[in-house]
Amino acid sequence: MVRGRHRSRDPQRRDLRGRDRRSASRTDARRQSAAERGCRRSQRGSAEGCACGRQTGPRAARSACCTACPSRSRRMSTTEGRPNFNGVPANKDFVAPSDSPVVHNLKKAGAIVIGLTNTPEFSFRGFTDNPLHGLTLNPWDPNITCGGSSGGAGSAVAAGIGTIAHGNDIGGSLRWPAHCNGVATIKPTQGRIPAFNGSATAERPMLAHLMSAQGPLARHVGDVRLALDVMSQADPRDPWWVPAPLAGPRPKGPIKVALARIPEDMDVDPSVRAALRQAADHLERSGYRVTEVDVPDIDGVWQTWCDIITNETVVMQEAGMLKVTSEDFHKAWGGMKTKANVLDLKAWMQATAARNGHIRAWQLFFEEYPVVLAPTTVKPTPGPRDDTVSADRVKEIFWGEIRFISAINVLGLPGAVVPVTLHDGKPIGVQLIAGRYREDLALDAAAAIEKRAGVLAHRLWETME
């Protein structure tokens, strides 16, 4: 609209300020608003929006696509000159020395970063709460979690605070908040979007790199796709970045989708089964061919993820984190460790070798089924602090409920989440998984579902007027 000179930035700035004020009190998702500063930047750049719109070609499209697009970065990401305390009181005086690659790429494309969103301490929980800024609420219902660790991002974008939000995902931190808040996202393939934290005092260990990914959250799948393109531009600070094309060859004939058969030990709520069936029907009506099948060793894949991430964290980070974190953090982290095997050096090497075998099995599976339709969780969204109830409750959540989310991280595969329906007024989403660097296939399937299911955030806004 702005690029095509159908609408100036001024009404967009006024809309942004108004919705920001109305929504923030309802969610507490934003921690430090740069909306006023962003709006001033938008005003200065109004003429640039029109000039940018006259450019042509793919690079020009990237330059113009985010012009005047209000975006939010999560607290774990660095924005030059802004605090970067990551939910930890001991870090409250940390100021980012430079923009992260994601923020740099967004700004380069014309996006206006309007603020930073809330995260749990060290972004290490699936529930967004911390001693500095407290609990972030879910705009649909304060009695359910907004997810984590990008819960502030998911809550904000659902409530209309910004168009695109940024998060990252090492165990579900993009996809879980997207599900909880009824928005769309993509956890890209490892290496798709460059990552670097200029505030970090040490390099991240290897498997943390291989299992984590940066990504966007938005209300519309089309905006997720747009933001993925922008965020994916090269940055020399990330040696793991991969210059892979954003679209690959189209599979011949109708695309076969594997509806993942859920393990018998996962107690599936009827509302989740109904949402999966509804998503499968949407895909069938869009020309896909959906078949319920077993996916390769989802239990073993999840256990490999749990063992690797837990042992790497215990060795590299645990002692330092426990010194400066809250009792709630200790409870949640203690619960996450209960399902992990303690690995010596040989067992660690065996776990990393097992990871290779799991990836190979899934890549072969994608030869027949290019897309997998899977649950995000098999249960209704839990309460806002359920991970502080007990260690058993944490294990129940990660192993018994969101197994299909965390398992995908160890494979390094792209996974999109799109909302499908509401149950008792709360959103339910599904996950679309594709082969390495085939985010296009996952997003195509997500867009097909969205076209028939609609954009759930619009229903939320009707209740917020």
Curated annotation (Swiss-Prot):
Gene3D superfamilies in the record: Amidase signature (AS) domain
Keyword entries, A-Z: Auxin biosynthesis, Hydrolase
Organism listed in the record: Bradyrhizobium japonicum
Domain of life: Bacteria
Basic and acidic residues biased stretches: 9-39
Enzyme class at the top of the EC tree: hydrolase
Pfam families: Amidase
Signal peptide start and end residues: none
GO MF term list: hydrolase activity
Protein name as catalogued: Indoleacetamide hydrolase
Family label: Belongs to the amidase family.
Enzyme nomenclature, EC number: 3.5.1.-
Keyword rRNA-binding (UniProt): no
Pathway: Plant hormone metabolism; auxin biosynthesis
Record InterPro entries: Amidase, Amidase_CS, Amidase_dom, AS_sf
Region (Disordered): 1-40
Keyword Hydrolase: yes
One of the GO biological process terms: auxin biosynthetic process
Role played: Hydrolyzes indole-3-acetamide (IAM) into indole-3-acetic acid (IAA).
Active site: 149 (charge relay system), 173 (acyl-ester intermediate)
